[in-house]
């Protein structure tokens, strides 16, 4: 019998690019499932002890799973959440400096790359690290809600026409379904729900439910539409009357008028349609939650307190009008910046507010309070007034704790355990760099007994002070994990595209990879040390109050530094033929290790001027002028002189 030669047909996998024959495809599914399994060679943030890392073999193409790894990376990049760098708070996370002073993109090798490559790297990095860079029960990975996306506040003409076209197509499909012989479609919503495409006055409803979006057909502005029960509509109207500007504004101050306009917008409307009361409130593109999510662990304590100060100001105004906010979730406050680059905060949900005398009614029982924000007295069976001014202070404390640390002060997997934790357990602070001033504010607000909590006026006086420019959510462990992901990411991109792209598009990746390797060595050394000692040194540097003699020494040293700055500026101005610009530093701008000698202020073993941007400039100025020694100071009638300081900390300045 003559043998017939059988041709094998090859099939290409669209994702991996690997070609398989029909014989291979006819094999058991077990091997193909193993090949499609998510590879373990991807960068993993967390416990890496149980996951082998064979990146170097993969990048050198010595491993057979390289096509699968590359396909998985490309798949993640395509499905990564996009970040718009034009909006505030959306600085590309791939461009953050892990340690040392923050650097703008123009000062780093990444700044020489084309924008599309930077965006690809950033989307890749965000997909790999979001939700893994912070511990469980955090602000942006708590599992209660999906990730909050930015929404437009104003639709252009094309977007509005596209919306109307989608609504018309949906209406046609509904009419076709109604006239067809198939089974009728049952509306799962009640008559109180808003329906997508419904027109109410000049508003077009966008979405379905009790809370949806609405677009004004005249201005194309985006609103939030809330369906109010009949009993609640009258209560909301009472709140509006108390907060809005009266006809005679002579009795109100300028701040009260400004706060009234923030709480009650002039474009807000309450419309009655089909026995429904609908509250139309103009919305903003960002909330405190979205801003904190975008900044991740790069947010500083000063940023947090500047936003929190605006929230406290809103609460003070509402309490002065006998109105209680009730809802203190970060999602419940819109956030934007005004023309003067200052924060503007206003409440999102007016329907959650209530008047003081309404709290005894059963309809308001725990309706507008999220469980993690409940005060201990609200969880008792004999409680009659479920919300009061003291519970407002507790909610403010929970909000500040979330903004400072990125997670809830009380978190459990079940409601009974959460209730018991709130009532009986004390909150704990993570090993982050948070000043004791902010900790004391939270501790005084989260007192179990309502009578022992800080009152609102004392809180207002406390939040108006100065706070350090230190990343309050950051610690050495997180930064080390962040550096590992960046180093592997840059290395893979460089080895993958160095033979395919122009040198100018791959050499910056190699330089960033080398910088990550240098920083990784520093982070590894810092992580070996006792983290508590680093934290204590940080706290002591921030919070120690100097004595009178220390203040005198600091002022003399500061005069020396400002004089050197002035002389340097004058010489540069003469060379550039311009007027000199006056540079005046304050004592709060410079670390005490540079302002005070080691004899009267012990220098931390972990401190070096290169670790702070201002200290680095001042130290270089003093070194260039050969003026590291302290000037003579009179201690009573005795002149005192001190030698130059000696720093034993790690120098992180680039070599």
Swiss-Prot record:
It comes from the Eukaryota. Residues 200-470 form the Protein kinase domain. GO terms for cellular component: nucleus. GO terms for biological process: antifungal innate immune response; defense response to fungus; defense response to Gram-negative bacterium; defense response to Gram-positive bacterium; negative regulation of gene expression; positive regulation of gene expression; positive regulation of proteasomal ubiquitin-dependent protein catabolic process; regulation of gene expression. Pfam families: Pkinase (PF00069). One of its GO terms (molecular function) is ATP binding. ATP binds at residues 206-214, 235. It is found in: Nucleus. Keywords: ATP-binding, Nucleotide-binding, Nucleus. Expressed in epidermis, pharynx, intestine, a subset of head neurons and motoneurons. Residues 1-35 are annotated as: Disordered. Residues 21-35 have a biased composition (Basic and acidic residues). Disruption phenotype: Arrested development at the second to third larval stages (L2-L3) and lethality between 5-10 days after hatching. Small and dumpy body morphology at the second to third larval stages (L2-L3), abnormal pharyngeal morphology, sterility. Growth and fertility defects are suppressed in a cebp-1 mutant background. Lethality is suppressed in several mutant backgrounds, including tir-1, or kinases nsy-1, sek-1 or mak-2. Levels of phosphorylated, active p38/MAPK pmk-1 are significantly increased. Increased levels of cebp-1 mRNA in multiple tissues. SUPFAM superfamilies: Protein kinase-like (PK-like) (SSF56112). May interact with transcription factor cebp-1 (via N-terminus). The protein kinase domain is predicted to be catalytically inactive. Adapter protein that regulates different signaling pathways. Required for larval development and viability. Involved in negatively modulating pmk-1 p38/MAPK signaling. Involved in innate immunity, acting either in a manner dependent upon, or independent of, the pmk-1 or pmk-3 p38/MAPK pathways. Has a protective role in response to infection by the Gram-negative bacterium P.aeruginosa, acting by negatively modulating expression of cebp-1, and regulating the pmk-1 p38/MAPK pathway, leading to activation of transcription factor skn-1. Belongs to the protein kinase superfamily. CAMK Ser/Thr protein kinase family. This is Protein nipi-3. It comes from Caenorhabditis elegans.
